[in-house]
């Protein structure tokens, strides 16, 4: 899994900290060993050994209350004799006294050689404030690993920038702050993180909007690419202000034609609006490019006070991934 310590960086001025929850998926009690790493691969502190009861037992580990962890960026690797699941929460350090900000992602149990992120940003304008991203890359192998990060601006067919990141130590994470990338223009991008040579990595991303909003999510490994995705719940301009963005990235290796990617939505029985939503991409999608839908701004497609499940499908069976963001 990936985890950050207390930190403030250019993409955000917040003092972020983490906690993670481990869940034992076995009927047997077990112990989890947690190794903490600094970005240079050295030990951040001595390993923790944490008991986790069987049958869904949990252990919650808070980095911001650990006196042995210095302020800064880092990563963690968790091992156990029994299968565990993990959830990482990023929050404001309670001692910082700042406006609350939070996000969460699933711990990564298996590395891959290629990861996809449908949406990242550098000083991009949005309806909810200026957007900036971190891309966090953890070495999940036993030797140093190098990667290339390709960033393709929305609407473009080729990467604007390919950034080589060399020699990430075992267990360590590299924090790529797009706000600090001088070679990148402002705007929204899709990203591809690919291992250069041998090894495997895990990837997550933080997307910051304005002063106080943050969304954390897992990148998609190449093994997850498919031609259809189901979304259990989409919100459209609810009375409590909830809205949804859907971003679909073309990973087929070639252009996807107009009308190939469909979005079909059925209202929940309790939805105030009972409209059925049916739409498709109105422009061709270049390789690694995206089509996006936004229930806040696309009022002609998405009625107000609507919620329900949706399905995304490629008529040509093109390989895609889909990112859903709630705001």
Label each PLM-derived region with a short phrase.
Residues 1-327:
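Gly/Pro-rich, tryptophan- and cysteine-flecked surface segments typical
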């Amino acid at each position: 899994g990936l985890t950050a310590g207390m930190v403030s960086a250019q993409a955000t001025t917040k003092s972020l900290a983490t906690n993670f929850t481990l869940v034992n998926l076995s009927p047997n009690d077990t112990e989890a060993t947690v190794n903490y790493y600094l970005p240079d691969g050295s030990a951040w502190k001595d390993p923790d050994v944490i008991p986790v009861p069987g049958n869904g037992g949990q252990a919650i580990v808070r980095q911001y209350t650990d006196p042995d962890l210095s302020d800064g960026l880092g990563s963690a690797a968790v091992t156990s004799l029994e299968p565990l699941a993990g959830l990482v929460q990023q929050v404001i350090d309670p001692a910082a006294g700042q406006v609350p900000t939070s996000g969460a992602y699933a711990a990564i149990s298996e590395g891959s050689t290629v990861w996809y992120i449908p949406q990242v940003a550098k000083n991009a304008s949005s309806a909810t404030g200026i957007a900036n991203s971190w891309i966090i890359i953890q070495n999940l192998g036993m030797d140093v690993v190098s990667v290339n990060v390709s960033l393709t601006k929305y609407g473009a067919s080729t990467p604007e920038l390919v950034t080589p990141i060399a020699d990430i130590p075992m267990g360590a994470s590299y924090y790529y702050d797009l706000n600090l990338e001088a070679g990148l223009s402002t705007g929204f991008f899709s990203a591809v993180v690919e291992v250069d040579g041998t090894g495997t990595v895990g990837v997550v991303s933080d997307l910051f909007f304005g002063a106080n909003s943050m969304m954390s999510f897992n990148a998609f490994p190449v093994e997850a690419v498919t031609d259809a995705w189901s979304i259990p719940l989409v919100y459209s301009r609810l009375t409590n202000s909830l809205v949804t963005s859907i971003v679909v990235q073309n990973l087929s290796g070639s252009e996807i034609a107009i009308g190939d990617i469909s979005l079909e939505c059925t209202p929940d029985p309790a939805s105030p609006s009972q409209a059925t939503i049916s739409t498709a991409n109105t422009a061709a999608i270049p390789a690694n490019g995206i089509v996006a839908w936004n229930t806040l701004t696309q009022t002609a497609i998405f009625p107000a006070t609507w919620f329900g499940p949706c399905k995304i499908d490629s008529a040509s069976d093109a390989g895609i991934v889909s990112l859903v963001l709630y705001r």
